[in-house]
């Protein structure tokens, strides 16, 4: 096989143990905090019918325009690898006739055909929260949830919350027309992408990272000038709730989201540490999404967090569990080790047991590299006496224990190790 074909596909990568542990830590933190806010876990398929996204994300979005992985199946349907989770979860809400209000949490990979760069791959992972049937008071609550996640990951000092409101449909339409007139005057200076967006959705130009576009944006109208009284009151209410919760924020009048289903409040937690990929958590309100999919009028708000981006910012060191390794020095010892390992695993102990060890010195080196706490040595002499030689890997001290008492001995060692870890954590927190 061609060696090049053994490499991960461009825009994807392998996750080795330490990074997997960090991903799982972020997932577990997100799930735990989500549960405190009443969110329950769900999962959707990795691939969906293309229409799930064509009818919801908007023709002007980059995802629809050039980033979806689509393919025909053998039945003639066009399927896509999910490029985001919100529309997929909304489809599930309708299909499964879930009771409202519904607070749903998802975690998993999504796929976009983008130019790979730091923290931006073609396969990446998201934590995702959707609150269907949510009134406007839920906007601040979702931002509080995200703020709590960042706090649990010790990232609050790394990010800044930016918020804005897109108002209602009338204000967006008026603002769109005003932007169109403004950008048409500067069309010759816009980037190629922005000239394309000018014909489809000029609001998307506000999200441009092109330096020339950014200079033009300085003089562009802002949407706040087009709010009606209700939109002003709603957005002021969101800001008052954030103030009441003590969550710092900045109003960014040019903040929009990249998908057409957003309306009302939008927000992003941004960092300056990741270059152009500055949004680590982002979301907003999408009151018309479910209706656009044929599911009725369901107000909703949600957000997604990029796991790769959070992982690149978060400091995390996986604490290995207490573990032991059997080092049997013969076939009979290997059979005894296998039985004992099975019993220890039944007690919840992490056990490595790889068969006969030809040389004890090499076996001890392997045990040390594996990071185990105890090496359990079984030779002919130990088998004859019904004993195990327990070597403490940190000190080198050795102790003989009867095979019949091995379970209690190792369980006691594990309990002591857990107690020491808790004491160390408590001391570090003082």
UniProtKB/Swiss-Prot annotation:
Q: Which PANTHER family match?
A: HISTIDINE--TRNA LIGASE, MITOCHONDRIAL-RELATED (PTHR43707:SF1), HISTIDYL-TRNA SYNTHETASE (PTHR43707)
An example GO BP is:
histidyl-tRNA aminoacylation
- State the oligomer form and interacting partners: Homodimer.
Q: Which gene encodes it?
A: hisS
Question: Which domain of life does this protein belong to?
Answer: Bacteria
Q: Which organism is it from?
A: Anaplasma marginale (strain Florida)
State the SUPFAM superfamilies in the record: Class II aaRS ABD-related (SSF52954), Class II aaRS and biotin synthetases (SSF55681)
Mind listing the UniProt keywords for this protein, alphabetically? Aminoacyl-tRNA synthetase, ATP-binding, Cytoplasm, Ligase, Nucleotide-binding, Protein biosynthesis
| Catalysed reactions listed for this entry | tRNA(His) + L-histidine + ATP = L-histidyl-tRNA(His) + AMP + diphosphate + H(+)
Q: Where in the cell?
A: Cytoplasm
InterPro entries reported in the protein's UniProt record: aa-tRNA-synth_II (IPR006195), aa-tRNA-synth_II/BPL/LPL (IPR045864), Anticodon-bd (IPR004154), Anticodon-bd_dom_sf (IPR036621), His-tRNA-ligase (IPR015807), HisRS-like_core (IPR041715), HisRS/HisZ (IPR004516)
Cited NCBIfam families: hisS
A Gene Ontology cellular component where this protein is annotated is:
cytoplasm
The record's annotation in PROSITE patterns points to: AA_TRNA_LIGASE_II
Under which name does UniProt file this protein? Histidine--tRNA ligase
Main localization category: cytoplasm
Q: What does the record give as EC number? A: 6.1.1.21
What GO molecular functions are on record for this protein?
A: ATP binding; histidine-tRNA ligase activity
Q: Name one Pfam family in it.
A: HGTP_anticodon
By sequence similarity, the record places it as follows: Belongs to the class-II aminoacyl-tRNA synthetase family.
């Amino acid at each position: 096989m061609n060696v090049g074909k053994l490499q991960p596909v461009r825009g994807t990568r392998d996750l080795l143990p330490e990074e997997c542990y960090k991903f799982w830590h972020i997932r577990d933190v997100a799930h735990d905090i989500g549960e405190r806010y009443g969110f329950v876990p769900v999962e959707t398929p990795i691939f969906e019918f293309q229409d799930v996204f064509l009818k919801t994300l908007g023709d002007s979005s980059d995802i629809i325009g050039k980033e979806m992985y689509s393919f025909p199946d053998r039945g003639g349907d066009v399927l896509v690898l999910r490029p985001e989770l919100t529309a997929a979860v909304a489809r599930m809400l309708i299909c499964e006739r879930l009771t409202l209000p519904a607070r749903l949490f998802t975690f998993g990979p999504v796929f976009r055909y983008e130019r790979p760069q730091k923290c931006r791959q073609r396969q990446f992972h998201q934590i995702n929260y959707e609150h269907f049937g949510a009134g406007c008071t839920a906007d601040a609550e979702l931002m509080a949830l995200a703020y709590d996640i960042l706090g649990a990951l010790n990232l609050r000092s790394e990010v800044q919350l930016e918020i804005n409101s897109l108002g209602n449909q009338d204000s967006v339409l008026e603002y769109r027309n005003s932007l169109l007139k403004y950008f048409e005057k500067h069309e010759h200076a816009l980037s190629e992408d922005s000239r394309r967006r000018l014909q489809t959705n000029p609001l998307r130009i506000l999200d441009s990272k092109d330096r020339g576009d950014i200079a033009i944006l300085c003089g562009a109208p802002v949407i706040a000038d087009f709010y009606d009284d209700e939109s002003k009151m709603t957005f002021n209410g969101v800001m008052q709730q954030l103030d009441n919760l003590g969550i710092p924020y900045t109003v960014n009048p040019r903040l929009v989201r990249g998908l057409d289903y957003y309306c009302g409040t939008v927000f992003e937690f941004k960092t300056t540490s990741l270059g152009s990929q500055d949004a680590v958590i982002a979301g907003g309100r999408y009151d018309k999404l479910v209706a656009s999919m044929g599911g009725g009028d369901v107000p909703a708000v949600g957000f997604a967090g990029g796991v790769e981006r959070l992982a690149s910012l978060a400091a995390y060191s996986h604490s290995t569990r207490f573990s032991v390794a059997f080092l049997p020095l013969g076939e009979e010892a290997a059979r005894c080790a296998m039985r004992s390992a099975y019993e220890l695993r039944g007690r919840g102990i992490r056990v490595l047991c790889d068969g006969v060890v030809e040389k004890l010195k090499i076996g001890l080196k392997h045990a040390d590299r594996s990071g185990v706490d105890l090496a359990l040595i079984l030779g002919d002499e130990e088998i004859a006496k019904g004993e195990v030689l327990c070597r403490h890997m940190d000190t080198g001290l050795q102790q003989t224990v009867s095979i019949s008492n091995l379970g209690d001995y190792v369980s006691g060692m594990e309990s002591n190790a857990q107690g020491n870890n808790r004491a160390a954590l408590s001391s570090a927190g003082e």
